Amino acid sequence: MNENLFASFATPTMMGLPIVILIVLFPSILFPSPDRLINNRLASIQQWLIQLTSKQMLSIHNRKGQTWALMLISLILFIGSTNLLGLLPHSFTPTTQLSMNLGMAIPLWAGTVITGFRHKTKASLAHFLPQGTPLPLIPMLVIIETISLFIQPMALAVRLTANITAGHLLIHLIGGATLALMDISTATAFITFTILILLTILEFAVALIQAYVFTLLVSLYLHDNT
């Protein structure tokens, strides 16, 4: 049966109900809790990655911003693991859904903005009007700054969706071309297969980079409001 090019991005359903939440939560069952007192290599690597990430993300924050440490670490681990699991064959990637990415971006962005208005009301309002603005340009700049503020969560979600979707489409297209060329030209099929392997390696890097970029931008929004 021929699949649509965008079939892998359709939300899977069971008895008419979306099972995205089940897909997202199921990988946690695959990692049993360790019973040993000394951590194994996998746990040591996880701790090292968490420490490195927290050092990069939280070094710019004050004490109020550092209260978001658990949220930021959980966010980067969730997005990174979801992106990596989506690279498995015949799997579903939740981060290709704009609705899910907006569901992550809007509450996090709103939380940073509300935190800013609660603790730094004057400084938050000052962002809408740069210092030294000529009087005739004040209404226009306030409108522009307001629009740019509300575009931030949309930019977060669209960036993640577009990058993950584009990579999956390229893998799908090059993989289909490789299968089609196997009966026509073995040498050409080998070249496209090599490109497919390199692109897959690149997608593993993109999956981690996009998780880092998403979390870093949330961290920067938090830094501007604390």
From Swiss-Prot:
Q: Where does this chain mainly localize? A: mitochondrion
Protein's UniProt name = ATP synthase F(0) complex subunit a
- Mind telling me which GO cellular component terms the entry cites? mitochondrial inner membrane; proton-transporting ATP synthase complex
Q: Which family does it belong to?
A: Belongs to the ATPase A chain family.
Relate the assembly described in the record: Component of the ATP synthase complex composed at least of ATP5F1A/subunit alpha, ATP5F1B/subunit beta, ATP5MC1/subunit c (homooctomer), MT-ATP6/subunit a, MT-ATP8/subunit 8, ATP5ME/subunit e, ATP5MF/subunit f, ATP5MG/subunit g, ATP5MK/subunit k, ATP5MJ/subunit j, ATP5F1C/subunit gamma, ATP5F1D/subunit delta, ATP5F1E/subunit epsilon, ATP5PF/subunit F6, ATP5PB/subunit b, ATP5PD/subunit d, ATP5PO/subunit OSCP.
Q: Which GO terms describe its molecular function?
A: proton channel activity; proton-transporting ATP synthase activity, rotational mechanism
Which reaction is this enzyme known to catalyze?
H(+)(in) = H(+)(out)
Q: In its keyword annotation, does this UniProt entry include Metal-binding?
A: no
Top-level taxon: Eukaryota
UniProt KW Mitochondrion keyword? yes
Provide this UniProt record's keywords sorted from A to Z.
ATP synthesis, CF(0), Hydrogen ion transport, Ion transport, Membrane, Mitochondrion, Mitochondrion inner membrane, Transmembrane, Transmembrane helix, Transport
Physiological role: Subunit a, of the mitochondrial membrane ATP synthase complex (F(1)F(0) ATP synthase or Complex V) that produces ATP from ADP in the presence of a proton gradient across the membrane which is generated by electron transport complexes of the respiratory chain. ATP synthase complex consist of a soluble F(1) head domain - the catalytic core - and a membrane F(1) domain - the membrane proton channel. These two domains are linked by a central stalk rotating inside the F(1) region and a stationary peripheral stalk.
